[in-house]
Amino acid sequence: MGGRRGPNRTSYYRNPLCEPGSSGASGGGHSSSASVSSVRSRSRTTSGTGLSSPPLAAQTVVPLQHCKIPELPVQASILFELQLFFCQLIALFVHYINIYKTVWWYPPSHPPSHTSLNFHLIDFNLLMVTTIVLGRRFIGSIVKEASQRGKVSLFRSILLFLTRFTVLTATGWSLCRSLIHLFRTYSFLNLLFLCYPFGMYIPFLQLNYDLRKTNLFSHVASMGPREAVSGLARSRDYFLTLRETWKQHTRQLYGPEAMPTHACCLSPSLIRNEVEFLKMDFNWRMKEVLVSSMLSAYYVAFVPVWFVKNTHYYDKRWSCELFLLVSISTSVILMQHLLPASYCDLLHKAAAHLGCWQKVDPALCSNVLQHPWTEECMWPQGVLVKHSKNVYKALGHYNVAIPSDVSHFRFHFFFSNPLRILNILLLLEGAVIVYQLYSLMSSEKWHQTISLALILFSNYYAFFKLLRDRLVLGKAYSYSASPQRDLDHRFS
């Protein structure tokens, strides 16, 4: 009694949070302060392995107290799309200045030019198609706002119908007229280059659909009756994929309205299901950011250059630099809109419930008590479990993640710190602004000076909003850190 345990003495422990009914309990709101059973497992220790059994306090599941962040103003979707469209038009305008600039400051004795641009060299049909492609999100937001359902007055319904009809008719007529002119003027290769990004759009955003397995482009004449029926079914599956992809794309256009919610529960299976849904939602938002930014940079920087005559000189290095600036700036602006502060806080709450595991060398814990991992248990911090012939140590307050699942580890790594996304965006946007300021001070050409000065304004606004969200979230989490430490000390 009170002596040191021998190597053959049996250790007893209770399964962590596996009491009946514990897996189905759930809580609401922003906290999960329901009474949680503590786990006290005795374990053998050894001084030669370098790894000791965690203390009793480390094996007690501490209730999570989620931080309540203030409600930050969210920009309306139609205003955001107007702002993004305006920034893209500015970038397109400065690129046309780079391509079609003139020597208007020369005296009349030199080659005369009364305007700052060679307007007679600009193809306005190509400019119209490029403008419509860049403004597709803004046009879609107008149509969505004009298609709202509900009880509205007769005058308002007529006004919404006329707005929707006018926008769609004007856009469709302008696009068809410009495309017909381009078909008559340019070769098939040029038109293929113009429409190339849309050919990659659906395959990039498809919903777990493998085009290599469908053989959609096989010859119909070589198919028998059964193959024809199966090919028709595959084509229907393909069009279903297109429809679902377009629905997801249009849903992601309006980030704040489609914001998911957090279910603060104590069921391990429900927590993992919520994390899977949030992973899918986050991946969709990142795909939308990547595709939209690359599409904007493509039509701003590359399309005008491709249709320039071979005898026309322009600064190729500046065109490539503009492509990078537009792609990075558009990515940051879209991520700031699709990943607001409330969404970062939502991902952080889910990561706190999910927990994380660290793989441990079995040779260092051979004499330490190890529990077999079960999916219906909520494991406390510091406990050792066996899973897939490996040993893992629990790191979070709640640990319901699958130890061998790399996606769960990545989710907890990225979102365990609620400020990580905002910090990355701030560093990226700050680096772009510093580079633009350096280029602005060192530039000697008038068109580059105008271009950098105009593009800087959009980056200033995005940097201000990111800095505001970062400061507010940082203050909120710093205030909630001390009560959480007091709660941890009380449970220990």
UniProtKB/Swiss-Prot annotation:
Main location: endoplasmic reticulum
GO cellular component, one term: membrane
Stretches assigned to coiled coil: none
Extent of Low complexity compositional bias: 31-53
Bilayer disposition of the protein: Multi-pass membrane protein
Keyword Transmembrane: yes
One Pfam family linked to the record: Tmp39
Transmembrane regions: 77-97, 115-135, 153-175, 185-205, 288-308, 322-342, 421-441, 447-467
Entry's localization field: Endoplasmic reticulum membrane
Residue segments, region Disordered: 1-53
Keywords: Endoplasmic reticulum, Glycoprotein, Membrane, Transmembrane, Transmembrane helix
Glycosylated residues (UniProt): N8
Domain of life: Eukaryota
Stated family: Belongs to the TMEM39 family.
Functional description taken from the UniProt entry: May protect the cells against DNA damage caused by exposure to the cold-warming stress and facilitates tissue damage repair during the recovery phase.
Listed name of the protein: Transmembrane protein 39B
Source species taxonomy: Eukaryota, Metazoa, Chordata, Craniata, Vertebrata
Name of the gene: Tmem39b
